[in-house]
Amino acid sequence: VDLGFWPEKTEIESLLVGNYVHSYFETKEAHEAFLERNQDKIISQRGKTAGQVKASFKQADKMIAALEKEELFNRLYHGTDDEMVEKERIITGTLEGIPFKCKIDSLNLSGGYFIDLKTMESLQSEKYSTTLHRYTKSLLYNIVEYQYTLQMYVYQELLKQTYGYEFTPYIMAVSKEPVPDKELILIDDTIIEMGRDIFYGNIKALKDALAHKSVEGCGHCDYCLTNKSLTMAKTVAEFLQQ
């Protein structure tokens, strides 16, 4: 299982913005290669703005600037001169017979922690979480509803398999707002346990998917919506019961 997105989604602009920010904090060479590879998507090709950097990537530069001035972020994400830090580290392993592959944004082998960099629409606006059954800040909503809980659990387990000890996970979140907000989140045992529960509650579905068996979709993620086909009309009452 590659903890990412299916191929049809890799070129969506919002994901490219995230990759733009990630590559900047990886290395100068990685960012330059990303710019060259995606120049036609970063530079507007039509209309009055032809030849100019698209607004979403100008916003990405603001997000980068917001993080770059934070001493805490720089110290943890890049590490100190005497620490061993690996960027975009590929880790593979097997959990309950299921093979996994993941890419860790910043892995500090000396400090025993890893950081996952997340770009989000907002950190403070409120959304209703169907998991928590209440309105909550977008930052927590994203962690729970996008199952970053599962991601952090799997990353921690694969690292334990690889290195023999437990790494502490962090999420560095930065928003896409006009003035970017940012927060460094320590992922504690409560969040890891939520991810563990999701994993063990979906082992059969994961194994069925790997065996190319037909599995029941959630009906609301981007993949399900991409493959959605209308078969009949629904009543308002059906939506009220959901």
In which residue ranges do the predicted regions lie?
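Secondary-structure boundary elements
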Residues: Y77-G79, N108-D116, L159-F167
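Short histidine-centered catalytic/ligand-binding loop motif
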Residues: E8-T10, T49-Q52, Y128-Y146, D188-T190
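A residue-level signal for conserved active-site and pocket-lining positions in enzyme catalytic cores
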Residues: H22, S106, F199
